[in-house]
């Protein structure tokens, strides 16, 4: 794990000094939100070309949660959540340091963005949007292992919220464990995995592991969904080796995301993202 951390630190340091981020870091973050949404949508079974999403973003017509295209609606919801994350990121050049949401607000807000289109389309009840799963609520999303219910769910959710907010924790380990808990515990009836990947982006930026906010950490899960599922099952096993394997998978996913960030920075600098 030490070698994985060192490799990640080296890659993120190189990204931090990419020439495109000197003046065009805002554009790079916008493009990262597009690529993250497209990759995450692919993981969720909602394939949408990046060019299509960019076109809608440029036209500023994603204000309504539903369209005639369910896949676009799903990806647009993830994009809205990613755009919200960008608003919480500190400036790369400047002194702006936005106030950070509480853990509970973070999860509920991202979940509203992600699942809002489902509720608008009548796929899920409005009462399930942004609300923790209750005993009587159905679980509409699969995942590794059996998700806890009732008191067992509350017993896992409270420590998860504390983990998100606890000061001084290693950034990689925090991001990986929070990601693993969200897809294992599944605190919402749906949208848990998409929210989990968004939270990873938030945490690694907030904690300074990848401060540019341009890494496309969803890319690896989209490229190798089998490896993602296998690593999630390893985490859900609860063994020390399984948790280690999951953290190493998260490190690899972030490395792939940083590589994609270097590519998008080149595209931003060349003006070829459209």
Which sequence ranges carry the predicted segments?
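FIC/Doc superfamily catalytic core
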Residues: 1-274
């Amino acid at each position: 794990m030490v070698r994985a951390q060192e490799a990640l630190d080296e890659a993120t340091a190189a990204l931090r000094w990419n020439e495109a981020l000197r003046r065009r870091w805002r554009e790079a973050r916008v493009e990262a939100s597009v690529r993250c949404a497209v990759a995450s949508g692919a993981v969720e079974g909602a394939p949408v070309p990046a060019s299509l999403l960019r076109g809608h973003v440029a036209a500023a017509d994603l204000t309504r949660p539903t369209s005639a295209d369910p896949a676009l609606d799903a990806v647009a919801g993830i994009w809205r959540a990613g755009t919200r994350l960008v608003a919480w990121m500190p400036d790369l050049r400047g002194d702006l340091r936005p106030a950070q949401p509480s853990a509970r607000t973070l999860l509920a807000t991202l979940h509203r963005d992600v699942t809002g289109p489902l509720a608008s389309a009548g796929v899920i009840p409005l009462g399930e949007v942004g609300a923790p799963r209750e005993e009587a609520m159905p679980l509409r999303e699969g995942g590794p292992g059996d998700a806890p219910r009732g008191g067992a769910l509350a017993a896992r959710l409270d420590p998860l919220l504390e983990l998100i907010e606890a000061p001084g924790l290693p950034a990689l380990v925090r991001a990986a464990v929070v990601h693993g808990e969200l897809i294992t515990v599944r605190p919402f009836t749906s949208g848990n995995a998409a929210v989990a990947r968004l939270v990873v982006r938030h945490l690694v930026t907030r904690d300074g592991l990848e401060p540019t906010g341009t890494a496309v950490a969803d890319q690896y899960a989209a490229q190798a969904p089998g490896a993602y599922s296998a690593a999630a099952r390893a985490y859900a096993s609860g063994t020390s080796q399984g948790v280690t394997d999951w953290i190493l998978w998260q490190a690899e996913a972030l490395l792939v995301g940083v590589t994609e960030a270097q590519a998008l920075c080149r595209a931003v600098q060349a003006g070829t993202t459209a």
